[in-house]
Amino acid sequence: MLKCLKYINFNELFWAKMVKKFKGFEDLEITDLLIAYRKAKADIFWEKNISAVERFINFEINFESNINDLFEVLKKADVEKIVSYCIDNEFYINYPKSIDFECNDEESKDFYSISSPAKEFERKLKDCEITISSRIVGNFTVQAHILSALWINFIGHKYDEKLSKNSYGSRLNRLNLENGCCTNESKYNLEKNTSFQPYFIPYKEWQSTGLNAVEKALEAKKNVMVFSLDLKSYYHNIDVEIINNDDF
């Protein structure tokens, strides 16, 4: 049980807690949750999700009580209770994404511009058909984020280890990477305060690698065709029934 947060030394926790195998919730220790909490909080910071930040602020008002309650529920492996802790009635938010205006053909033929953005907006509200787009974003509880980080610390890092160097997105922080790729010595970095590598670093590497490949192909007098795809609402259109498929 956690007695007093202000006396926790996270550096000592990391040296005492190496990456270990998951043997069941009954073997869970409070230090496992503290490390997972630290990573979850840092990961949320980089996402810049205001709603999630507010949840963490409220969680820390009674931190010791909240973390101990979660610890006890996990130790009992009470699945129904765990799910109720992780998902509440505010588990998603509709964030405004864009406003599109479809104006009539006659108006599109007029070559004029209004210098005031506010007046131009008022005119479009009056004369054009409006389509408002939003994006569904997860707004999970702090307990859900802790459980996610806990899963990564115990199990998820093993899946990440099997990915090739050609997988750039959302890779975990590791030690002793060789040319950005996992080796037998590149263990999951439990001591790092975040779970994932900063997005912009692998993105830049992915971009540069692609451009270099194109340049080399052109230098070799080869024909090159480059496709850059952004699938619209991909995750929102996945059929969750695939989970029930034995092949999956």
Identify the residue ranges that each predicted region occupies.
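Conserved two-metal-ion catalytic palm core of "right-hand" nucleic acid polymerases
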Residues: 2-248
